[in-house]
């Protein structure tokens, strides 16, 4: 079982006791449906054959990065779950470019 704790620094906790921290995201992720988007992204990555740890860490990072991209264009206060989904492609592109 992997446990994901979202906060200023999100933590992905593994069954072996390892913890991976991610600092992407903002307060906009408190919006309704953001956790569902994260779950869907992780499930999609698992469906593509990623290992559980990779899917969890990458999913947390992509959703957090999507929230940051949104806040850079608009305001994190107006972030919606749909906005996160709409920016996932941009987040993935930015991640691949770096």
Describe every region a protein language model picked out.
Residues 1-98:
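Small-residue (G/A/S/T)-rich helix-start motifs and N-terminal tracts that mark the onset
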């Amino acid at each position: 079982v992997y446990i994901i704790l979202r906060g200023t620094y999100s933590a992905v906790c593994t069954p072996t006791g390892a913890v991976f921290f991610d600092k992407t995201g903002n307060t906009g992720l408190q919006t309704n449906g953001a956790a569902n988007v994260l779950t869907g992204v992780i499930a999609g990555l698992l469906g593509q054959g990623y290992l559980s740890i990779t899917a969890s860490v990458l999913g947390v990072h992509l959703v957090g990065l999507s929230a940051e991209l949104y806040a850079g264009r608009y305001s994190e206060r107006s972030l919606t779950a749909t906005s996160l989904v709409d920016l996932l492609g941009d987040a993935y592109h930015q991640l691949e470019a770096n």
